[in-house]
Amino acid sequence: MSDQNEKSPSWVGDIIKLSPKYLLGLAVFSGIGLWLGNVGLGKTLGIKDAINSYKLYLGLVFLASTSFILSHFIWWISLGIKNKIDQKYSYKLQKERLRNLNRREKQILSPYIFDDVRSVELSITDGTAQELEHLKIIYRSSNISNRGSYFAYNIQPWARGYLTKNKHLLHESIDHIL
């Protein structure tokens, strides 16, 4: 097998990997070229004969580039839909988790709502705080510790709003107090 045949698939792969902005340029160029081959302006510009000679190649470039642009667009739309579905599912799980807080989680989240504080210092070794951070209910607002392993954590705006509307979720149950 010759070197030329071994290298041919790589240029095809390179074309497939082109950014949509370059594909759009190819589509516009080849589309205008095809159009100019059929109108008097092409003859006026002196390119009608050249376009007609390469019409097959221009047509292939036009079809391929518009197909790739369309596939990029469909992929972009599908990613957007997937992200929306994932976000909605995640939000549903987060709200469900807030409806089933244990005592330690209520202790961590209560100051944000009842004391109206924006930041609470929590130990980075506190597993409950880390779980709330993993669930994206709170987030570490600073990577610099003030006191050893204690870092400032803020509550996510959506969680603050949800818990402010549902303060009863942070109250201790009467059975536990008795």
UniProtKB/Swiss-Prot annotation:
Keyword terms: Cell membrane, Membrane, Transmembrane, Transmembrane helix
Topology term for the membrane: Multi-pass membrane protein
Compartments reported by the entry: Cell membrane
Keyword S-adenosyl-L-methionine: no
Pfam families to which the protein is assigned, alphabetical: SieB (PF14163)
Residues annotated as transmembrane: 22-42, 57-77
InterPro entries referenced in this protein's UniProt entry, alphabetically: SieB
Location, primary (coarse class): membrane
GO cellular component, one term: plasma membrane
Recorded superkingdom: Bacteria
Full protein name: SPbeta prophage-derived uncharacterized protein YopH
